[in-house]
C-alpha cells in the first residue's frame, strides 16, 4: 500500500486501487494499438498480487508505522509479484508477459528507463532478486513467440505500462505542495513531461484521447503511529472511511 504521511496521520492508497487508476489511464490513451485490450488488462491488474498483502498489512518494524510498499521485505515483494504474474497470465497471456516484464523491471531500474528506482533492502538479498529477474527473463522469448508478438511491439507496450504505472503513482502519492516535475520515457524515444499545477497535474505532450482527465483516488486516513501490533493497524484500516481525492490531468495551456 502507498503510505503518505500527513502530520500525525497517514493517507493510504491501496496498491490495487493504484493499479485500477493505471488501467483508467490506459483506457484514455490516444493512438492505435493492436494489443490495446491486453495493455489495459496489464495496467489494471499489474499489482493484483498485492491484494494478498493488503488483506493482512503489517507495521514497519523499524518505525512501527504502516509499511509503505517500497519498504516491504524483498522476499515478500517477490512472492507477491509471482502470484500476480500467474493471476494475470491466466486471464490474458499477453498481459501476463507485460506484468512479468514490469515486475522484473522494478529491480532493474525499469530496464534503464528509471535508473534512480531503488527498493529498500534489495541489495541485502541481491541473489534472490537476481534469481527472480532471471526466472522472468527466461520465459520472455517462448511466451512472445507463442503470442506471435515482435520484440519491438512488446517493448513499446512495456514502456507504455511504465508510463501508466508512474503517472498513477504520482497521482496517488499526491502532495498539496506539489512534487517536482517528472519525466517518463515514451516509445519512439519521446519523453512525457509531468508537472504539478496546484493539486492537479499538467502533461506534455498531451497523450490522451480526451481534453482533460479527472481521476478519483480512493484514500483512507489513519493514525501514523500508536499501533500496538499488526492487528491494530488492520483494524484501523478496516474502520477508516473511504474518501476520494480528485486529481485532474490537463494539457499545458
Regions found by a protein language model. Give the residues of each.
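An active-site-proximal "capping" alpha-helix that borders the catalytic cofactor pocket
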Residues: 16-30
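Short, surface-exposed loop/strand segments
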Residues: 31-32, 36-37
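Divalent metal-dependent catalytic cores for phosphoryl transfer on phosphate-bearing substrates
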Residues: 2-13, 23-24, 39-174
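Residue-identity detector for threonine
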Residues: 6-9, 22, 34, 61-63, ...
Amino acid at each position: 500500500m502507498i503510505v503518505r504521511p500527513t502530520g500525525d496521520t497517514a493517507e493510504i492508497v491501496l496498491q490495487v486501487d493504484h493499479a485500477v487508476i493505471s488501467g483508467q489511464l490506459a483506457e484514455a490513451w490516444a493512438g492505435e494499438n493492436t494489443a490495446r485490450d491486453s495493455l489495459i488488462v496489464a495496467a489494471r491488474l499489474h499489482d493484483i498480487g498485492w491484494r494478498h498483502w493488503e488483506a493482512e498489512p503489517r507495521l514497519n518494524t523499524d518505525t512501527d508505522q504502516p509499511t509503505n510498499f517500497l519498504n516491504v521485505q524483498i522476499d515478500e515483494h517477490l512472492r507477491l509479484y509471482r502470484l500476480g504474474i500467474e493471476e494475470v497470465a491466466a486471464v490474458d497471456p499477453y498481459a501476463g508477459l507485460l506484468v512479468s516484464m514490469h515486475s522484473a523491471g522494478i529491480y532493474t531500474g525499469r530496464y534503464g528507463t528509471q535508473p534512480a528506482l531503488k527498493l529498500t533492502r534489495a541489495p541485502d538479498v541481491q541473489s534472490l532478486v537476481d534469481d527472480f529477474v532471471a526466472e522472468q527473463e527466461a520465459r520472455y522469448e517462448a511466451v512472445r513467440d507463442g503470442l506471435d508478438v515482435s520484440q519491438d511491439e512488446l517493448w513499446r507496450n512495456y514502456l507504455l505500462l511504465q508510463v501508466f504505472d508512474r503517472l498513477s503513482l504520482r497521482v496517488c502519492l499526491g502532495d498539496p505542495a506539489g512534487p517536482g516535475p517528472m519525466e517518463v520515457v515514451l516509445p519512439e524515444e519521446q519523453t512525457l513531461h509531468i508537472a504539478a499545477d496546484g493539486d492537479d497535474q499538467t502533461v506534455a505532450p498531451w497523450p490522451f484521447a480526451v481534453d482533460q482527465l479527472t481521476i478519483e483516488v480512493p484514500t483512507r486516513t489513519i493514525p501514523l503511529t500508536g499501533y500496538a501490533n499488526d492487528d491494530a493497524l488492520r483494524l484501523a484500516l478496516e474502520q477508516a472511511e473511504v474518501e476520494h481525492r480528485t486529481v485532474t490531468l490537463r494539457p499545458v495551456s
